[in-house]
Amino acid sequence: MEPGKLTPIRRSNAAALVPRERILIAAARLFRERGYRATTVRDIGREVGIQSGSLFHHFASKEQMLVEMLREAAISLCAGAQARIASSSDPVERLRVLIRFEMECFVGSQTRDYFAVLVSEWRDVPAAIQPELQWHRTRYSEITRDVMEDCLAIGKLRLPPDAAERVLHGITNGAVSWFKSHGRYSVSEFSDIVASLLLAEG
């Protein structure tokens, strides 16, 4: 399924009681903390301070909330990565930029919980959207692998590209559970540490 064929996100014309994105951000946080199945529409309404029934002015169901946050995470991950690495032709700098971008998505952005849910709630993704999300997962893997292979070609990668890719994604996915924005490391500092694990010296 190509990007041009993606189903557009439908925006409700109903009067907004609270911003739509605020509801999604709250829902994503609850999905990450409690799990999608354990979170109720009432929980989400309570989190944003409105009656659960009012949520249906914005979303047809809890499943639609899940679909929209996953779609946004998947699309922005691919599009953002491509845009960031296009700023440099140097393989090492491109990898550093990619690492920083991935860290920002998973632990530094306002929608970081979208990405956490993308990882943790895959089993609950509706069948209709799975091919779309899988296309983006594959595309992001290709982007990452290409950057890794370019670094290897100039002798700057410590690991085989497939192993380096898994290390990177494993670190960023794991950071979701422990990284604190006001903790010991900033996103930039921790990104540099990850880069030092993957890039050869000299």
How would you name each of these model-derived features?
Residues 1-7, 97, 101-105, 141-150, ...:
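C-terminal peripheral helix-coil segments that are non-catalytic and often amphipathic
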Residues 22, 26, 30-64, 68:
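Helix-turn-helix
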Residues 68, 82-110, 165-168:
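Hydrophobic alpha-helical connector segments
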Residues 75-78, 117, 127-154, 162-166, ...:
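Amphipathic alpha-helical packing segments from all-alpha helical-bundle domains
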Residues 1-18, 29:
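N-terminal intrinsically disordered/low-complexity leader segments
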Residues 19-27, 44, 69-77, 81, ...:
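Generic hydrophobic, amphipathic alpha-helix propensity
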Residues 107-128, 145, 177:
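Amphipathic alpha-helical segments used for helix-helix packing
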Residues 36-37, 157, 185:
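Conserved hydrophobic residue
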